[in-house]
Every structure is written in structure tokens, then in C-alpha cells.
A protein has these predicted regions:
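Active-site proximal loop and beta-alpha junction motif in alpha/beta enzyme cores
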Residues: 1-193
Length: 193
């Protein structure tokens, strides 16, 4: 807080871990990691692209192709909870500096996140520490394709994976008030499986 305004927020994520490295998919090699969801990561240069708005249509097409090819494979299976299985998104990145990357996260049906994506940043942290690109105590910076920034670092580990903290800017978006009518038979939600 500064002058009564929130400057940034941070969250501690679920254990993050490397799923696989060097997986051939859609004509390139990707690394796959989990950080709350499973993501495929590749350098934008592997497609002859950069993480810039001008290349966004090609990045989206490449991300969707990767997701389609990997979906349903053993790589996309969460090792402990099948409900968490599936390639949630693909992330293309480019190195800006030793502890600084520019990323774009493509998810769902070709949607692009305005942020570097918290769960993807946590997964990327696991990959970077695993390959020695960053040290266990380093904080690294992820910029999104539109310039929003996260800072991430490892804060510990468990048998399930690396514990990470992701910090970014925050802006008030509104006030929300929810009501629960006691007569609503589905007011507390439902699950169909």
C-alpha cells in the first residue's frame, strides 16, 4: 500500500513441478510443467516469432496447434489427480535478460492472458530452477505481451514440488455483492460428473 492504494499483491502457489522436457509436438520441442495447471512452454524463436503484438496471430495459431497435439497424451496427465489433467495452455517466451523473460500464455480456444499468468509463471519457475537458468534464491521477472509484470521466486519445496510466490500489480475492478436465496435448490452450486 502506498497513499491508500494497493501497489502489488502476491500469492503462494500450489507445488509446481517439471512434467517432461524436450517433447516433440507440432514440429518443435516443448517443455511441460505444472503450476496449478499443466502448460507447454517453447521459445517463440522456435517458430521464427517474437513475443510482440505483431506476431500474436501466429503465436495463437501455434499455441492452439501445440495444445491440440498434446491434449489427451500421457504428458497431459496429472500424476495424482485426473481432474487436473489436460494441457491448460501454451506459453511462448523470449529471453530479455538473465532473470527476465517476455511471455504470452494462450489458453482455452485461443484466448490470450493479459498477465504473464500466475500458474504458468509458477510452472515456468520450476522449469528455470530445474535447468539451472535461475538459482534457488533468485527472483525472476515475467512480462506479458502487453507489458504487465510478475516477479516470481521459489520459497521452498515439498515432496510434490517447488513452492513459489508470484507477485504482480493489482487494480480495484469493482465491488461485488452476492446473494443466496435460501429457497434456491442449487444456490450453493452443483456438480455433474
Amino acid at each position: 500500500m502506498r497513499a491508500g492504494e494497493v501497489q502489488s499483491v502476491a500469492f503462494r502457489n500450489v507445488p509446481s513441478f517439471v512434467v517432461a522436457r524436450g517433447v516433440a509436438a507440432a514440429g518443435i520441442e516443448v517443455d511441460v510443467a505444472y503450476g496449478g495447471a499443466i502448460y507447454a512452454f517453447a521459445p517463440a524463436s522456435s517458430r521464427g516469432l517474437r513475443v510482440v503484438p505483431e506476431d500474436l496471430p501466429e503465436l495463437i495459431a501455434a499455441g492452439r496447434a501445440l495444445q491440440r497435439e498434446l491434449e489427451g497424451t500421457e504428458i497431459a496427465r496429472h500424476p495424482e489427480d485426473d481432474r487436473l489433467s489436460g494441457i491448460y495452455g501454451t506459453v511462448f517466451y523470449e529471453q530479455v535478460g538473465p532473470l527476465h523473460q517476455r511471455t504470452v500464455a494462450i489458453f482455452a480456444d485461443g484466448e490470450v492472458d493479459r498477465s504473464p499468468t500466475g500458474s504458468a509463471t509458477a510452472a515456468r519457475t520450476a522449469l528455470l530452477i530445474d535447468d539451472g537458468s535461475i538459482g534457488d534464491t533468485d527472483t525472476w521477472r515475467a512480462d506479458s505481451i502487453v507489458g504487465t509484470t510478475f516477479h516470481a521466486r521459489a520459497i521452498g519445496s515439498t515432496p510434490e514440488g517447488l513452492l513459489t510466490e508470484v507477485q504482480g500489480t493489482a487494480f480495484r475492478t469493482g465491488r461485488h455483492r452476492f446473494y443466496l436465496d435460501p429457497r434456491d435448490p442449487l444456490g450453493t452450486g452443483f456438480v455433474l460428473r
